[in-house]
Regions:
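Domain-scale signature associated with acetyltransferase and cell-envelope carbohydrate enzymes
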Residues: 1-160, 176-185
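Short glycine/proline- and charge-enriched loop/turn segments
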Residues: 161-173
Length: 186
């Protein structure tokens, strides 16, 4: 009897052994040690301190410098949180100071653009979690711009509108590509 059939037998069986085995398995799954606040409170605080300390070291020593190397010039006081953004394609990125950028952000440049697509991010800009910025030719985010999580700025669609061209694997056409400019304080 393999593990799957044993599980099914214990879950649906009518015998006392099957019911007892299923109750024991559920008790193990939901089991826990009783909480002792004097012990578990400090352990919880230690867990948070270790996690935050390790995250700080990884962010300052690893992810921020690596991402800065992808920029045209390093950005002052760049704050990456939650990892490193995914950058795809030949996009050129310039960034002002005091930018907060989620590590779960995707920045892509249209592969067939010439010259290379440009993403210009001003000062004091916040870009939220799971935001996608698809740069067709140029996207400008002015100073003090806030972009919520899961936003999508589409400067190009990534495929042609014509079904035959799409099926042939052709790239999107130049008339489908546009600039996106979010002025200051948007």
């Amino acid at each position: 009897m393999n593990a799957t059939s044993l599980r099914q037998w214990a879950k649906t069986g009518d015998s006392a052994t099957a019911r007892m085995l299923w109750r024991a398995a559920k008790a193990l799954r939901y089991g826990s040690v009783p909480c002792i606040p004097a012990i578990h409170g400090p352990l919880y605080a230690l867990n948070g301190a270790l996690k935050n300390g390790f995250g700080f070291i990884v962010r300052t020593v690893w992810t921020t410098p690596l991402f800065q190397s992808r920029l045209e010039q390093p950005a002052e006081r760049l704050y990456l949180y939650g990892g490193m953004p995914l950058v795809l394609g030949p996009v050129k990125i310039s960034m002002g100071s005091d930018v907060r950028l989620s590590g779960h952000t995707t920045i892509s440049g249209k592969p067939t653009s010439h010259p290379a697509p440009r993403l210009e991010i001003g000062n004091n800009v916040g870009i939220g979690w799971q935001t996608t910025i698809a740069v067709g030719s140029r996207i400008v985010l002015g100073d003090n711009v806030r972009i919520a999580g899961r936003a999508f700025l589409a400067g190009y669609p990534g495929h042609p509108l014509d079904a035959a061209d799409r099926a042939a694997g052709k790239p999107c056409t130049s008339n489908q590509t546009g600039d996106i400019i979010l002025e200051k304080d948007v």
